[in-house]
A protein has these predicted regions:
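S-adenosylmethionine
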Residues: 1-163
Length: 163
């Protein structure tokens, strides 16, 4: 059951699509992963994960949750990042190019940041800010695991970044 205030806001926002929104809670969870282009030389076999392409993300794939790719040594080695497929859309829409400077203001745990870094291909600068110190530490770990070397991880209030 959704809190009434939230439900009322969503009804007003979605109008005739509100029923579809409610029905989405009864659908199976979509699970996805993104291959890491910074480790593109990887030739391992990911077929056991039953991958199907995410239409809006060339490095993104749906997987069968029962295959549990988070337990694979490939995941620990940073060859891919587990990410909900809809969360792959912002970086695809921004489409940063190698050599550009990019800011991810609310960066943890690192899904968007690692995807942005993959698009930069080690060129340019990615500034990743996370206001919560514990989450910033998780973000740093994910950046390191995926082999990202052109990123700066900050733990600041966004207002301080303008000073």
């Amino acid at each position: 059951m959704l809190p009434e205030g939230f439900a009322a806001r969503m009804r007003a926002l979605l109008g005739s699509e509100y029923g579809d929104f409610l029905a989405s809670f009864d659908r199976p969870l979509c699970t996805g992963l993104r291959k890491n282009p910074l480790k593109a030389s990887f030739t391992g076999d990911l077929s056991r994960f039953s991958l199907a392409p995410v239409p809006w993300c060339p490095t993104g794939f749906y997987y069968d949750a029962a295959s549990r790719p988070g337990l694979s040594p490939y995941h620990a080695a940073g060859l891919y990042y587990l990410q909900e497929p809809s969360a792959m859309a912002p970086a695809e829409l921004l489409d940063p190019q190698p050599g550009e400077r990019v800011l991810d203001l609310c960066a943890a745990p690192g899904g968007k940041s690692t995807q942005l870094a993959g698009k930069l291909l080690g060129k340019g600068l990615l500034v990743c800010n996370e206001i919560n110190a514990k989450r910033a530490k998780i973000l740093s770990g994910n950046m390191e695991r995926l082999g990202i070397s052109n990123a700066l991880v900050l733990n600041e209030h966004p207002k301080k970044l303008t000073e």
